[in-house]
Amino acid sequence: RIKAANGDDYYLDDNDCIMPNSHYTSDLIIATGNINKWFASNYISPLSKALMGNELWRNQIEQINVLPDLGVELIPRVGNHIVYLGQMPFYKNKEKRKAAVVDFVNRKMNRLEKFYKYGLSQAGWNRYSYINLEFDNQIICKRRDKRRDDNESLGEALAASDVIGNVEAE
């Protein structure tokens, strides 16, 4: 289901075609934010299909949010944090684009699964407010217990984050 910032509210079917909104409540991942119909069909649909095709992510991810720069955030059901994937790969060829999006999602979510299993299970599900998976081989997490105000230096803000390196998908 798509609820875009521009007011559009619709569903995508299995063929990536737009369907009108209905009053039926469905158990789907909702996508919000800076989404036009082309982006929904070409990027959100393969992203959500990849998430829904995995039992863990089908149960854990409840929302996809697209930022103005087209970066993608995921909102999980468990844990009070946001997961940032980064910007999805862009290809003009539809088949290459779909394959690249699925590969992108699988690589990021494999890293997140390991982090959930070996990191958050030890540190606590609510330790971090933001988990950034944008960069390969590292996960950057913003700790919840530190707030940045306007007078705080960049060094103090960075000290409020944890960088976990060498996190690769197998």
Model regions: which residues?
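Charged, solvent-exposed interaction patches on well-folded alpha/beta domains
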Residues: R1-E170
